[in-house]
Curated annotation (Swiss-Prot):
It comes from the Eukaryota. InterPro entries: SKA1, SKA1_MBD_sf. Residues 129-252 are annotated as: Microtubule binding. It comes from Xenopus tropicalis. This is SKA complex subunit 1.
Amino acid sequence: MDPGDLDELCSHVNSKISLIKKTLQLRNIGQDPSLNSVLSKIAFEMHSLYNLLNNLETEVQRQETIANSLRELQATVERDFTEASHLKENIPPHLPKRTQSSSSAPDEAPEMVVKVAAPEPAKKPSKEKPIKEMELITVHEFGTVPAYMKNRLTYEQINNIIEELNKAVVGKYKILHQPLKSLSNQARKQLSRYKEEETKDTKGQFFIVDQDIKDFTQVKVDKRFHGMLSILRHCHRLREIRGKGLVRYIIC
């Protein structure tokens, strides 16, 4: 037999003998009446320690769950803060601004009420026929526009073009709504053209054509302009009706 194997066998036998001795010693201790109370106390402490470890493990798991929830909440708050900052930095100039009347003293309120209730401003709108205009797009709507449509166009540029097109709509339909006798020669020529451009598909609709845009605005009807129209169609602000060599932009 190899000397190394013999040494390993001897070490194994000695280890077993040592283990048997310790077992016999513990057995003898367990049979000693004077040590029974000590062993019982140790057993109780071991049981308490086991319960404590279980409670500790449960608490660790609970804290991990809370930590995960807090991380998710932090991500949500950071995202909302980023969106709010973007909205604050990109507030459209078209929105109404707060007037000083909101911070006026209480004794000024009766005067403000009298001005609002004045009969003349209340009667003026009823004398004019309403003209349908396009609503400005929201930041959310602009976010839904595909990137290939946007190209380098910005949210503000799209709302600016909406305002320009609304000028053309208002300018055209003010002429249409005026009595014929009150129109100038130029306005009468425009009125005649408006009538010729109407079709059965445009009945009851508000629409303009390229010539109206040239007459009432400084907008260039070019490739960039038609790119903006694609975004307005996507956002359901207008649609097109073609016929008789004209493209009619119907206000939605």
